[in-house]
Amino acid sequence: MAISLLCLFLITLVSLIFVVKKIKHSKWDLPPSPPTFPVIGNLHQVGELPHRSFQRLAERTGHVMLLHFGFVPVTVISSREAAEEVLRTHDLKCCTRPKLVGSRLISRGFKDISFTPYGEEWRERRKFLVRELFCFKKVQYFGYIVEEECNLLVKKLTESAVGRPPVDLSKSLFWLAASILFRIAFGQSFHDNKFIDEDKIDELIFETETAQASFTCSDFFPIAGLGWLADWISGKHRWLNNVFFKLDALFQRVIDDHSDPGRWKDHKDIVDVMLDVMHKQGKDDSLRLTIDHIKGFLTNIIIAGIDTGALTMIWAMTELARNPELMKNVQGEIRDSFGNNKERITKEDLNKVPFLNMVIKETFRLHPVAPLLLPRETMTHIKVQGYDIPPKRRILVNTWAIGRDPTLWINPEEFNPERFINNPVDYRGQHFELLPFGSGRRICPGMGLGITIVELGLLNLLYFFDWRAPDGMTHKDIDTEEAGILTVVKKVPLKLVPVRVQ
């Protein structure tokens, strides 16, 4: 305790000296800020759900708002117009990433796609990953895996429906997304994999996301190593390293398995491709891969891929279960389109259900998987809504707040897919009131695959089954309480009773 108090005193003392030296009239017309405390700035105003805290602060301060996290200024964007200026008008000037402690560790020194600062190396890595995994041709090819895994889920749910017990749909949909991504990336079924513990993988993914988005004193008090000392005393470094080692052990087992010449595989997966490139590359090749690069890529593919699919399906089914008439309407569209005797849903069926697509859009609006886009950092001075944002400043775009802006959406807290009837707004990065995948150079490269998983998953759930609340509950008892930082999960798992439709 004495050491912690001494550390806090030293941070405060050095910080106050730093502030006094920095006080001067700024030449910039900076965005407005809410009142701050000495040393900590606005950190005391950030709750367990930062996107909600930022929305409340923006309502009082402005949609372009300057916060201070310790000694680090952060601009928070909460309007469509400001988001368009950041992500389109000034995209090239602010498309790099800040170098944060958690993201540096999990990305193995920025050897991934998501957290690597902008530059030639990042462009080459992204180009490679899109070509080998996320381009339209690859997504179409991997469609058979999505179909097969959805079919397996239908069979399991059909077996569960015999006695009509409630099913943990949150876990079932997580496993569906994980099974698809593991087969695509690793060439093996999630359930049959000998080195993956099904009961612990969701915990590892949640821990990894928390590590990537965690607030550390090292990030916000970068003065004389005192922030690092505070993290060491609090156990933050130990926890981050523990998450890293667990994730690293998983990916090392994957790589070792792929290095076995006798391994059976049903297709050449992305790990095979990356290992081939690594073994055959020349010193003059524009793309240089090491084992750390491969592990960094796998972190992006698995973590982001599973979340996009699983969480979107969970939130969509949550909202439909809370609105029985709405569920009946979307099921009516699907069953009228497909008839009563369809045995299997395929990717060719995706363009036959426009109302389901509206349900997905509305889910993205009300429950974006990433409520705050990954932080950007300005490389040069820019102006947003008339305010100056100097170089080396972090920017957060609050897509969750934009999706609930009453100036853009009528009754924004209401789940109403019909708002998208005759509405051209789409989620592919060109309409800045709906940004589940971001926009510009940093738009999510796996958007196409993620959408395919969501569409086919929901189609199977809604065509083959009716859904009821568990005994003792009604649809009004199903809540939407959130948890998480980098991504937002349903805090209480969604449990529903499947009724197989004959």
Swiss-Prot record:
Its EC number is 1.14.-.-. Its cofactor is heme. Heme binds at residue 444. SUPFAM superfamilies: Cytochrome P450 (SSF48264). GO terms for molecular function: heme binding; iron ion binding; monooxygenase activity; oxidoreductase activity, acting on paired donors, with incorporation or reduction of molecular oxygen. The keyword rRNA-binding does not apply. It is an enzyme of class 1 (oxidoreductase). It is a single-pass membrane protein. GO terms for cellular component: membrane. The chain crosses the membrane at residues 1-21. It holds the Pfam family p450. CDD domains: CYP71-like (cd11072). The keyword RNA-binding does not apply. It is found in: Membrane. This is Cytochrome P450 71B16. Belongs to the cytochrome P450 family. Keywords: Heme, Iron, Membrane, Metal-binding, Monooxygenase, Oxidoreductase, Transmembrane, Transmembrane helix.
